[in-house]
């Protein structure tokens, strides 16, 4: 018998997360490691747990995540979106609540490219009037 699970994909910056939601006791595993071990920063862990806390499902699911690309913040944001999408696949009634909190929206902000003749994307050389 196959294990029933819900799936959601999340992306942020250059990070991608594949999230699998199963009935369980609240364990969150990212790339084979527990959430607390994978993310050193508490803020990243809080970001990941937000959709579960909002829908009061912290103890009802085991979550298996595969995160790739980007850095800590990007991966945390990608996982959050993936969890939100998987929760909606599990229960459609949660969608309005999650959308209102902003968890269903893909954060479209990307790194602006460096321009030729400038130091960075917008940082130019110091201007001298004389």
Swiss-Prot record:
NCBIfam families: PRK00132.1. Keywords: Ribonucleoprotein, Ribosomal protein. This is Small ribosomal subunit protein uS9. It comes from the Bacteria. Coiled coil: none annotated. One of its GO terms (biological process) is translation. One of its GO terms (cellular component) is cytosolic small ribosomal subunit. It comes from Stenotrophomonas maltophilia (strain K279a). Belongs to the universal ribosomal protein uS9 family. One of its GO terms (molecular function) is structural constituent of ribosome.
């Amino acid at each position: 018998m196959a294990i029933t699970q819900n799936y959601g994909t999340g992306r942020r910056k250059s990070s991608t997360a594949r999230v699998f939601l199963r009935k369980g006791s609240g364990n969150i595993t990212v790339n084979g490691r527990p959430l607390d071990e994978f993310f050193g920063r508490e803020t990243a862990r809080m970001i990941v747990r937000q959709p579960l806390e909002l829908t009061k499902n912290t103890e009802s699911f085991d979550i298996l995540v595969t995160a790739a690309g980007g850095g800590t913040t990007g991966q945390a944001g990608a996982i959050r979106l993936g969890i939100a999408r998987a929760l909606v696949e599990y229960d459609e009634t949660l969608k309005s609540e999650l959308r209102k909190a902003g968890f269903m929206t893909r954060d479209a902000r990307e790194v602006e490219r460096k321009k030729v003749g400038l130091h960075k994307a917008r940082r130019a050389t110091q201007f001298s009037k004389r």
